[in-house]
Amino acid sequence: MDFFSWVMITAGFGMAIGSLGTGIGQGLAVKSALEGVARNPGASGKILTTMMIGLAMIESLAIYVFVVAMIILFANPFQDVVLELLAK
């Protein structure tokens, strides 16, 4: 396989693992918030506000993974070095 195939596979696996972690984290956060609201409905506003801030922090992981995948695909800093090594 050539360099570009490995780049595509790496970006794909990175997005898959990052999205899996983000999805699990958000699911656990929502589960815990709903359990807290079920136990104490009076604190639902405070719990939901805290949950939304937490979800935004968790979602930032997916955004960072996406940015790294785009860098790997389109602005790979090792592309020139690898192509020179492959040409030898």
UniProtKB/Swiss-Prot annotation:
Keywords: ATP synthesis, Cell inner membrane, Cell membrane, CF(0), Hydrogen ion transport, Ion transport, Lipid-binding, Membrane, Transmembrane, Transmembrane helix, Transport. The chain crosses the membrane at residues 4-24, 53-73. The record marks 59 as: Reversibly protonated during proton transport. Disulfide bonds: none annotated. F-type ATPases have 2 components, F(1) - the catalytic core - and F(0) - the membrane proton channel. F(1) has five subunits: alpha(3), beta(3), gamma(1), delta(1), epsilon(1). F(0) has three main subunits: a(1), b(2) and c(10-14). The alpha and beta chains form an alternating ring which encloses part of the gamma chain. F(1) is attached to F(0) by a central stalk formed by the gamma and epsilon chains, while a peripheral stalk is formed by the delta and b chains. HAMAP family: ATP_synth_c_bact. NCBIfam families: ATP_synt_c. This is ATP synthase subunit c 2. It comes from Syntrophotalea carbinolica (strain DSM 2380 / NBRC 103641 / GraBd1) (Pelobacter carbinolicus). The lineage of its organism: Bacteria, Pseudomonadati, Thermodesulfobacteriota, Desulfuromonadia, Desulfuromonadales. The gene is atpE2.
